[in-house]
């Protein structure tokens, strides 16, 4: 997105770009799901270079596959829990109500279900981490932050 020279500081801006590119409602919903994941999973490295679009040969724009999705909350950092992109003007302490209001303003349907699905995935982090053999030290550290 940086090559387009649009100033994007908020998730609202990201959705404006999606509308300008004529993304489908399904893809805008997927963008919303990714935003919810970033908020709930403490992926605060959610800057604009971590969101991309691809143009298909027929000239239609689509969201790219998700990438650079990592746990990035460091309790020892000055920037602990500060998101790069804001949600309703907030970089931290983003609530479920904020996510629902955002969805309403962006005409995203089934926001409550999306939030619940993502919450379930995040709350089951330990089982996913154990399957891919993440060290127990890191599992405990990440779980502590996710459960705060």
Regions found by a protein language model. Give the residues of each.
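Anionic ligand-binding catalytic core segments
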Residues: 1-48, 52-148
